[in-house]
Amino acid sequence: MKSLSYKRIYKSQEYLATLGTIEYRSLFGSYSLTVDDTVFAMVSDGELYLRACEQSAQYCVKHPPVWLTYKKCGRSVTLNYYRVDESLWRNQLKLVRLSKYSLDAALKEKSTRNTRERLKDLPNMSFHLEAILGEVGIKDVRALRILGAKMCWLRLRQQNSLVTEKILFMLEGAIIGIHEAALPVARRQELAEWADSLTPKQEFPAELE
């Protein structure tokens, strides 16, 4: 399996060379890929995983992600990295663009690493919401802000299809520091339309004359 991972690392270095010099090191039994000592991707069992971020949310809507997991004390831990499938490997321009999103988000997080706020200190953040975010690997304010409301909501919805639009509004409010009821009307409508676009519409047979 190591040989497969090394092949994937070398292929990633070739395809993503425009991002800069890509180095790798062992991490969690896998390999982290870095540019300027900033981790933006992982290679595990011969597969490349990109760091999820707000800008990659739309891609993950159209391509339901497979998340990177590893074992810790006998239980599976999910990381915020999604697998690059073969169709994405065949589209190098898109792969480079998504990888750049991941790198930029990682650099942004690195610049704010000196503060590690607790989720429970944010508006709209109930104990239950903090708990379910933790279950999908979102454990602090920095991760919430880097991923953005849409990506966090997608993570929750992938775990539980009954997650409502109200949770999306609560996440957005938590990120910008206001109660969900005080969200600007235009932003609330944009989020609602985005969430609605993900819900399959039920079709009814035409009525007979």
Swiss-Prot record:
<comment type="similarity">
    <text>Belongs to the Sxy/TfoX family.</text>
</comment>
<dbReference type="InterPro" id="IPR047525">
    <property type="entry name" value="TfoX-like"/>
</dbReference>
<comment type="function">
    <text>Induces low levels of natural DNA uptake by inducing transcription of the competence genes (the CRP-S regulon) required for DNA transformation. Induction of the CRP-S regulon also requires Sxy-activated promoter (CRP-S), cAMP receptor protein (CRP) and cAMP. Induces CRP-S site-containing genes which are involved in genome maintenance and transcription or encoding transposases and toxin-antitoxin pairs.</text>
</comment>
<dbReference type="Pfam" id="PF04994">
    <property type="entry name" value="TfoX_C"/>
</dbReference>
<dbReference type="GO" id="GO:0006355">
    <property type="term" value="P:regulation of DNA-templated transcription"/>
</dbReference>
<dbReference type="InterPro" id="IPR007077">
    <property type="entry name" value="TfoX_C"/>
</dbReference>
<dbReference type="GO" id="GO:0030420">
    <property type="term" value="P:establishment of competence for transformation"/>
</dbReference>
<dbReference type="GO" id="GO:1903658">
    <property type="term" value="P:positive regulation of type IV pilus biogenesis"/>
</dbReference>
<dbReference type="InterPro" id="IPR007076">
    <property type="entry name" value="TfoX_N"/>
</dbReference>
<keyword id="KW-0010">Activator</keyword>
<keyword id="KW-0178">Competence</keyword>
<keyword id="KW-0804">Transcription</keyword>
<protein>
    <recommendedName>
        <fullName>Protein Sxy</fullName>
    </recommendedName>
</protein>
<keyword id="KW-0805">Transcription regulation</keyword>
<dbReference type="InterPro" id="IPR026256">
    <property type="entry name" value="TfoX-like_gammaprotbact"/>
</dbReference>
<dbReference type="Pfam" id="PF04993">
    <property type="entry name" value="TfoX_N"/>
</dbReference>
<dbReference type="GO" id="GO:0009290">
    <property type="term" value="P:DNA import into cell involved in transformation"/>
</dbReference>
